[in-house]
Amino acid sequence: MDKTAKKILIVEDDQFLRDFYQELLTAEGYQIDVAPDGDIALEKLSQGGWDLVLLDIMLPKKDGLQILQDIKTTPPKSAIGPIVVLTNLGHDTVINKAFVLGAGGYLVKSALNPDEVLKEVKSFLQKS
């Protein structure tokens, strides 16, 4: 594995989407890890060192907004890059709350295609 590859954490409970993101981003040379629920996500996030986090809002155990709040309250051991919220909820209130809690951006899952995902990931990584 390339030690210079950017590290991305995918927090998504839907197995199909998790596999989709993982395969797509691994093929581009990114180092990927996954978390299927909020508790596992917080455990992995607490270690820090992520260049980018793709965080679903609707998760079992702890939702994405709770995770953002926990990170804000108790920062990770080392820095993490932007947190991009993944949601089917295009509601302004949910998105605004995510930004208030520290999200760096959002993607509406229903509008995504592979090229768009790669474009957005590259854009967020360049900003970090």
Which residues does each PLM region occupy?
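Active-site residues of response regulator receiver
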Residues: 56, 87
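Two-component/phosphorelay signaling modules centered on CheY-like receiver
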Residues: 15-33
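The feature encodes the CheY-like receiver
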Residues: 60, 91
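Acidic, metal-coordinating helix/loop segments flanking the phosphotransfer/catalytic sites
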Residues: 34-52
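As written
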Residues: 64, 99-105
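Conserved acidic carboxylate
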Residues: 12
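Acidic catalytic/metal-coordinating carboxylates
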Residues: 37, 63-69
